Amino acid sequence: MIILGCFVLLGSALPLTAQLIWQGLEKQHPPKVLDRLGSYDAVVVLSGMLSGFSYKGTFRSEWADPDRFFAGIEVLKSGKTSTLIFTRGLLPWGNSKAEGEILKIKAIEMGVNETQIILSDTVYNTAEEARAVKELMEENGIDKI
């Protein structure tokens, strides 16, 4: 029984197992087609898509899972919203800028007007992101996200 338990534990720790579980979950909720989206006051892009490393004493960020960033830009450029909200998720690696600040720079580089971007306060997890977005909605008169 112990040997079987070890195999189950090792098997569930494999990256392949995690990938299969994620695929199963995401298959049930595919991304919406842009043409089928309605209009929104803002689109929210949550943090958690950058990773980072230190190089010669400075922090460098790199994409880990950028699909939500590019989807937010696409929704904005389609005219379905006029505002992007980025959350300032704090990256746990070194002394880096909050993720929302990095994403804002990247969005501006892609042609988004700075006035169309709102940043939340610094947040450390998804629950804090939700509260920060709610506050921004109230402060900016945003009803539909």
Show where each model-derived region lies.
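A structural signal for short, hydrophobic/glycine-enriched beta-strand patches
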Residues: G11-I145
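Cytosolic-side transmembrane helix boundary signature
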Residues: M1-L4
